[in-house]
């Protein structure tokens, strides 16, 4: 099994269509395809940061998106994710951004989404059918408990 740490350059070129997840020590939280994860970050940047990547949520948008969240920054990351979750509730599902670098791109499923999805805070569902933000919080809590860095890795 080859593991590749994401960085913006590598991520966009090589890992976009691979399965990715959050890893803390030997705990792995599967997310889904890399383009799905990029969509979450794109949606946050476009809708909550006025398209200025990392301007409001630098720990998640800059540090973690590069591939690793230092254990010393986990509290800040948790607070940023709480704000993101709250603020995304104000946006309808049609405000999802699949790729901030190409706003014409749409999710593979188009507008065919579950009626349970009522806003952008519950739009993102992992490949295992779990709420993405819940899984994200679980990974951050594990990082805090174990005092080990969280990484984004492909399998």
Model-flagged regions — what are they?
Residues 2-138, 142-155:
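Acidic (Asp/Glu-rich) sequence patches and key acidic residues
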């Amino acid at each position: 099994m080859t593991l590749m740490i994401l960085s913006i350059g590598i991520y966009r070129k090589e890992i976009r269509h691979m399965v990715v997840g959050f890893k803390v020590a030997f705990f792995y939280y599967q997310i889904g395809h890399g383009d799905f994860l990029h969509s979450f970050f794109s949606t946050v940047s476009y809708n909550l940061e006025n398209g200025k990547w990392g301007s409001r949520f630098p720990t998640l948008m800059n540090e973690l998106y590069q591939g690793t969240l230092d254990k010393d920054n986990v509290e800040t990351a948790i607070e940023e994710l709480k704000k993101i979750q709250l603020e995304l509730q104000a946006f309808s599902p049609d405000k999802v951004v699949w790729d901030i670098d190409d706003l014409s791109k749409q999710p593979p499923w188009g507008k065919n989404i579950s009626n349970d999805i009522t806003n952008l805070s519950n739009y993102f569902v992992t490949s295992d059918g779990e709420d993405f933000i819940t899984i994200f919080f679980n990974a951050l809590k594990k990082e805090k408990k174990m005092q080990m860095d969280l990484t984004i890795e492909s399998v």
